[in-house]
Amino acid sequence: MIDLDIPDLDIEDLDPDLEDQTQKNGVEDESGGALTYAVIGSGQGGGKIAKAFYDLGYKKTVAFNTAQSDLALLDLPDEHKFFVDHFGGQGAGKNQERGKEAYEAKSQEIFNKLREIFGENIDRILITVGAAGGTG
């Protein structure tokens, strides 16, 4: 069993500049399933897995990465990609502590992106990672 230390984040009450209805619904899901899933892809491996879900119709998908070059390789609409710019585009260099530092520094922006894409009406969130590098 993997012991994950997921901290509680103090997220300030900032709303992204969105229309109320868009904020409530987020991106329209096209999967046709009984439940509405949202997918988070972290790092290069997680981003590729998230992209596969996007291609299956799970449009409430966001790929995060600290390496801009890895995000550029993903065939996702730009609004579904989030560059965690903390190291000048060079990524976390397979160092998980640097990845953690980057995500903590950008936690509010990450939260806003998730809220923009996911909206408020989701049933489950899948988090996909490769776990071999610094961001996943």
Report the location of each language-model feature.
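Tubulin/FtsZ superfamily GTPase core signature
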Residues: 1-136
